Amino acid sequence: MNVAQCLTRGHVLGLPRLEAQILFLHATGRSLHDRAWLLAHDTDEVLPEHIAAFEALAQRRLQLEPVAYIVGQKEFFGLTLAIDKRVLDPRADTEVLVDWALACGLGLERPKYLDLGTGSGAIALALKSQLSEAEVLAVDNSAEALSLAAQNAHNLALHVSFLQSNWFSQVQGKFNV
C-alpha cells in the first residue's frame, strides 16, 4: 500500500482528510508539520508496521478520542503545545480570544494578563509569545494541568508565572486583561 492509498483508507474509515494526514504522519514518525511530504511522496510504499500503527490511531480517533490526545500535541497560535488528558484540547476558535486580549494590551507599556483555567497554557503562552514585555499569570486549580502548562512554557522558552488557585482565591494584584 502506498501513501495515497493509506490516506484514502483513512477517509474510507471515516476520518476527515486533515485528521488522516496528521495521524499518518504521527504513525510514520514524521513531523506533523510535514504535510507537503505527503504530496511529494504519495506513491511511496508504506511499511506494514506503519500501516498497522496508522490504522490503530484511526480506530482511536473513530472512538472520538481527540487527535491532540492521540498525537500528544496541538498547534495553537503558531505554537506547538504538548497536550494530554490532564487538559482540554485547545480549540482553534480560542485564538480569537488571544487576538482580542492582544488588542486590549496595545498601547500599554507592560500589560498584565490573567489567564484563569489555563489548562495547557495555550492562551497565556500565545500572549507571551506575541508580547514579550507582558506580565502573564496563568492560574489553574489542577496541579496536573499546571505541570503540563509549565512544561509547555519551558519547551517554548517563554516566561509565564503559574499559580494553583481556585479561580481568584489565591490571585493577588491588578490586571489589565
Predicted regions and their residues:
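SAM-dependent Rossmann-like transferase core, predominantly class I methyltransferases
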Residues: 51-131, 136-151, 162-164, 169-171
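N-terminal auxiliary segments of SAM/dcSAM-dependent transferases
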Residues: 1-71
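Short SAM/SAH-binding signature in class I
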Residues: 175-177
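Structured loop/turn residues at beta-strand edges in well-structured enzyme cores
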Residues: 18, 108, 158, 173
